[in-house]
């Protein structure tokens, strides 16, 4: 019997050990559960290959202080690229080697928000997680991480996803409620996430261990 396919979207390719390990572990556990899983190669907004668009901006009014912080991080990132040390280059190379040997990615790489929504990959089910994929402090449109690009007839679930905060800003609550309702099943990493989902939607989320 052919295995059911699962497409996973998560935070990856940001040269961070935690992000790399959680993405590998999520894919690995899906495979161990009997599914044919692969990672949707959508570049996170912090990846230098990601192309920003108007539609990829945060889906709620972003606080000025957070915008200033994001701009500061952007400047620091550009400076680091100019004066990139051999150790940083080596680290990036090792991450790329890890991807080749241990991760399985979608055939197409999505560098833009519009690419993902206009031509989404096809799977039997879609998963988001783990990591802080729902953190409202992220300066990007979180719709991809709520699987809004997925056809409504498909199974959409989160696995050990994290908000990274204990509450959602009032200005973003409407969007979060709508996005959470888009998911067929909800699994979160922290107990506070269970409470937050209940508070926002009245739904019962499953508290599950980060893979």
What are the language-model segments listed below?
Residues 183-190:
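A short beta-strand/loop micro-motif in the catalytic core of glycosyltransferases
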Residues 133, 192-193:
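Alpha-helix capping/helix-boundary segments
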Residues 5-17, 21-178:
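Aromatic- and Gly/Pro-rich donor/ligand-binding loops
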Residues 194-211:
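Helix-loop-beta element that forms the nucleotide-linked donor phosphate-binding surface
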Residues 24, 190-191:
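Alpha-helix N-cap/helix-start capping motif
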């Amino acid at each position: 019997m052919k295995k059911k396919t699962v497409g996973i979207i998560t935070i990856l390719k940001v040269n961070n050990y935690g992000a790399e390990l959680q993405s590998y572990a999520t894919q690995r556990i899906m495979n161990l559960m009997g599914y044919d899983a692969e990672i949707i190669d959508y570049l996170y907004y912090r990846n230098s290959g990601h192309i920003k668009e108007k539609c990829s901006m945060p889906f709620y009014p972003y606080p000025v202080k957070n915008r200033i912080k994001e701009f500061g991080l952007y400047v620091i990132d550009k400076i680091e690229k100019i004066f990139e040390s051999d150790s940083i280059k080596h680290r990036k190379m090792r991450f790329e080697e890890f991807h080749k040997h241990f991760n399985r990615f979608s055939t197409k790489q999505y560098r833009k928000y519009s690419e993902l929504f206009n031509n989404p990959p096809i799977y039997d089910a879609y998963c988001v997680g783990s990591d802080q994929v729902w953190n409202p402090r992220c300066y990007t449109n979180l719709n991809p991480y709520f699987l809004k690009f997925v056809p409504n007839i498909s199974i959409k679930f989160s696995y050990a996803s994290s908000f990274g905060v204990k509450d959602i800003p009032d200005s973003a609550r409407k969007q979060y409620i709508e996005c959470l309702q888009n998911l067929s099943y909800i699994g979160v990493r922290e107990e506070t996430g269970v409470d937050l989902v209940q508070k926002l939607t009245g739904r019962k989320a499953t508290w599950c261990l980060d893979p």
